[in-house]
Amino acid sequence: MNLLDVIELNARYGDALDRFDLAAWKALFTANAAYRAQARENFDRGLPLAAIYLDGHGMMADRIMTIEKTLVFAPRFTRHIIGLPTLVDESTARTPFLVVQTVTTTLPEILATGCYHDTLAVTPDGVRLASRNAVYDNALIPNSLVYPL
């Protein structure tokens, strides 16, 4: 695995979420991967509390179904601006991110800034996320956190 592999993974990740292709988003994780969206305060203190915690493809599929079939919320668009990753070692990386949200009737607003803390795995399909903790810097999230960061 090299830096370009991680950049490509992150590009596909942001693109999938910005297109609301949650099946493509889920495919970027290993089958037993964990995904969290967690406030920096909790992360820094080693607290497990997270706004979103998904453990494995099963929980990810449940979240996708909930978003697509049952949740009622104002139509919105997101744009993920993902920085260059820092490879911590051969299987972990940190990558800064910015997510801008536009609700169709309002001006765009910053939804979250932060850092992805990733454990990576090389699979036959390429580099995949074995875990991603999206640690957001802001203590407050505008409205609600519906989609993954």
Model regions and ranges:
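A general boundary/transition motif marking the beginning of the first structured unit of a protein
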Residues: M1, Y13, P48-I52, P108
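Short, low-complexity N-terminal intrinsically disordered segments enriched in polar/charged residues
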Residues: M1-A31
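A generic "alpha-helical surface" signal
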Residues: L4-I7, A16, A51, G58, ...
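Short helix-to-loop capping/linker segments positioned immediately adjacent to catalytic or ligand/cofactor-binding
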Residues: Y13-G14, T70-R76, T104-T106
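Short, hydrophobic secondary-structure boundary micro-motifs
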Residues: K26, R36-A37, A130
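A solvent-exposed, acidic/Ser-Thr-rich amphipathic alpha-helical stretch
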Residues: A31-T92, P96
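A beta-strand edge to alpha-helix "cap/lid" segment located at domain peripheries
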Residues: F77-I81, T86-L149
